[in-house]
């Protein structure tokens, strides 16, 4: 594993560390498979929960705390070693030119950022950081947007999430929340 950029390389213990940034709205089976892939390549993984300040919107229905709980439940259910990852909430700054610096102020040193999102990839590369793509795991199905759509339409959504995450969403009233916040009192 190569050093990401001067001053950002391997941690003091000499371990290869990866970064995975996502909104996880909600955390689904594709995210879980991606984390498995990353942990096969890295000694440790930093999971950054982006847009941490947003919740209760149709695009971002869950709070940062709820998303962290979902990730923890799924990784525990899949028997991932908790010493191999950390989960850190990262609020947005709304300015692309400073977003990477902002994120770096929240996370420990890492070697590589894993992403398939074109803007995220571009911003990290412009900052001189190493970026690697993640293999897509049935992206057409495993998509948070698709899961939220299925919830709204009353279609099967549970099969796309780890069982512990589906149960958690139901336990916090997440289904009704997504339906409520998608409605509007405005005439179209």
Residue ranges and their predicted role:
Residues 2-188:
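Nucleotidyltransferase catalytic core that binds NTPs
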């Amino acid at each position: 594993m190569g050093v990401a950029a001067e001053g950002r390389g391997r941690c003091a213990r000499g371990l290869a560390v990866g970064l995975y940034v996502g909104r996880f709205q909600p955390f689904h089976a594709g995210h879980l498979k991606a984390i498995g892939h990353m942990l096969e390549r890295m000694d440790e993984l930093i999971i950054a929960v982006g847009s941490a300040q947003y919740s209760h919107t149709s695009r971002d229905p869950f709070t940062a705390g709820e998303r962290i709980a979902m990730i923890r439940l799924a990784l525990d259910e899949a028997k991932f070693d908790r010493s191999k990852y950390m989960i850190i909430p990262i609020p947005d700054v709304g300015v692309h030119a400073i977003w990477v610096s902002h994120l770096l102020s929240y996370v420990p040193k890492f070697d590589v950022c894993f992403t398939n999102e074109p803007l995220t990839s571009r911003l990290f590369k412009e900052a001189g950081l190493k970026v690697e793509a993640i293999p897509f795991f049935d992206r057409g199905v495993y998509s948070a947007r698709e899961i939220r759509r299925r919830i709204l339409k009353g279609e099967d959504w549970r099969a796309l999430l780890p069982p512990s995450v589906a149960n958690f969403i139901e336990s916090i009233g997440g289904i009704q929340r997504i339906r409520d916040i998608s409605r509007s009192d405005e005439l179209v």
